[in-house]
């Protein structure tokens, strides 16, 4: 038998936006309110930039702190498979085998949405309409980068290959060298799509109805959470906690999705890197730095 989830009241859009601003940054850290933490981190970062050399010691401290936590995270990840097995066994035991159907729906929805977004928005609208490059030519040129990122699930690791493909589209070196590395950190279209799909998955598994207005709020939060997500495998799953907390959905969703995250990751990274190239094409076109005659993709 299944155990129903006792849903909390879902906050309004206005409440969610207001809750992003922390009244006490240390309380946000202790309660793991990630949206408030990100907001405060942005303010602190801007302040340190304005301080210039005076802020250098603090920046050095945070860089060392970041590297230390990366090492700790790597150690923890070694034990992740055992933890995921235990968590999934617990969730399935509580809620029954019915949770398997939403898995199939989630994988299908994630792949279909990412595919349509990549083909029609990035390839058709951005590269085709705004960039003036044939979508067929665009995707032929991007083929290597797409296959590589599909296998590695890392947009950061794909930067060199994405740079090569983008320059083969006729984008100038100075535009490509700026847009592609920047986009690998800031432009996470696929991650935003995945997080929205994951929330719908959670609502189905735990029997929580989300209104259209609440789904729009989830989409806004997903976009905010995806900005700056690390371009490495599994980072989208970590940032999903922000979106789940925003609508008071159970964090057990992370355990349920962890087992299929690699499959979902393979889909969501493609819009990330294709979007970077499409943006580079649009920017290059607007700046007169796009040279279609240099495109090396075969017709």
Describe each region flagged by the PLM.
Residues 42-46, 83-90, 123, 127, ...:
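Transmembrane alpha-helix boundary and packing residues in multipass membrane permease domains
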Residues 51-56, 64-67, 95, 131-134, ...:
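Juxtamembrane helix-boundary/capping and inter-helix hinge elements in multi-pass membrane proteins
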Residues 139-195, 220-237, 260-282:
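Alpha-helical membrane segments and immediately flanking helix-loop junctions
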Residues 77-91, 151-157, 252-256:
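Hydrophobic alpha-helical transmembrane segments in multi-pass integral membrane proteins
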Residues 196-299:
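Transmembrane alpha-helical segments and their short flanking loops
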Residues 71-78, 168-184, 212-214, 251-255, ...:
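Membrane-interface alpha-helices at helix entry/exit sites of multi-pass transporters
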Residues 1, 109-144, 148-149, 155-158, ...:
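Transmembrane alpha-helices that form the ion-translocation and gating core
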